[in-house]
Structure formats: C-alpha cells, structure tokens
C-alpha cells in the first residue's frame, strides 16, 4: 500500500491492525481474536523493520464490554507490542466499548487511558465507541399479520430476523420488546417470527399480558 499512500492527494497517517491473541468475547462469530482469525497481525508475524512509514497501531478486541476487559486486553497489547511504540504517533484502542451503557465504569476507563498516556506520552490515544454512540436510540415497529398455531402460537410480523435484525440469527440475540416478558412470565406466550420463506426466520419467544391480534403493533427496542 505504500505506493498508494505516496500517490494520495492528501496526507494519510497509516497504521497497522495487530492481534494480541487475547479477547473475552463469548460469541466466536464476534471474536476478532478467535483461533484462525484473519483480523490483525499477530506478534509472531510482526517484523519491526517493516514499520518504516507506519505511524500507528490499532487493535479491536472488545464486543459490548466494560473497561475492566479493556484493561486486561491492553496489558496483552503492551506486553507484545510495546517495543514498537517508540516510533509511532498514535494507537487506536478499537471499538466494542459500551461507554454509554448504564453501569459502564467511566472512571476506570479514564484511569486506563491516563495511565497509558503517562507511560507513552508521545502516543495519541484513539477510541471508537461504535455502538455506544447509538445505544437505545432506535426502535423497529412491526405489525402482526397473522397468528399461526404450532407448539406455541406464532405471531407472523411484517418484519424479518433475516433481513432486518440478522444478529438474532447470528449470535443468537434476543431483542427487547416493549411490554413483553420472558416465556411464561406473562399471561400469554408466543413466538415472534418473520414473513420470509426461511424456516428459521424466528425472532424469539415472548410473553404478553394478552394474546396478540392481527394488526397489533410490536415494538422492538434498541434497534
């Protein structure tokens, strides 16, 4: 990429993504440091002499996590890559920080960043809050198209897990539904499903105070 950088019409500060082979992400699909991950250069393949012109390092090892996990990840990053910090200008701590989530330990994050800056005062620290910027800011409003009887009543909605909320199928992830509870928690339990031909286009099982009817609105929070 060096020829492309040299030919760029504006100045670019190039960096490399590194992989410290350490993360605490429970779902393998979202774990950038899982065995066999293609994301980031591992220490064993890291050649210091190849850093000419490189101004920063980037690591992304978190997924919806708190500052305590960042602290442990950062310790691994320093252990492996600190010898290369001297010639750099910046380091990017990546995303996955749930900074705006209630209960997030902001004071601990401040201490972590301040401590790192004290150890490496020449490095600018970059954070990518990612999802935290938009946490709890959007809703998806669906309507009930039909009720199908199976082992449980199935409410067919005019939305789709596959098309509109793929994390439901990938993680799996259970979206929050306004006014709904866990299965059996409220008077009527049903399965919410999409309208596609995918057999597994199922959003989850929820309970409601009263049976859903065709035309009722179902509001998914934190979309």
Model-derived regions: residue spans:
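Generic, low-specificity signal for short hydrophobic/alpha-helical stretches with a mild N-terminal bias
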Residues: 28-31, 56-59, 95, 126, ...
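Charged (often Lys/Glu-rich) extended helix/loop segments that serve as interaction or gating elements
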Residues: 112, 124-223
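Glycine-rich anion-binding loop/nest that anchors nucleotide
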Residues: 58-61, 88-94, 194-196, 216, ...
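Flexible loop/turn segments at secondary-structure boundaries
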Residues: 23-24, 63-66, 98-101, 133-136, ...
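Active-site-proximal beta-alpha core segment in soluble small-molecule metabolic enzymes
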Residues: 1-92, 103-105, 112-115, 119, ...
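Oxyanion-binding "anion nests"
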Residues: 90-92, 98, 109-133
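Generic beta-structure capping elements
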Residues: 17-21, 96, 160, 195
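Residue-level marker of positions within ordered structural domains that often coincide
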Residues: 21, 35, 62, 98, ...
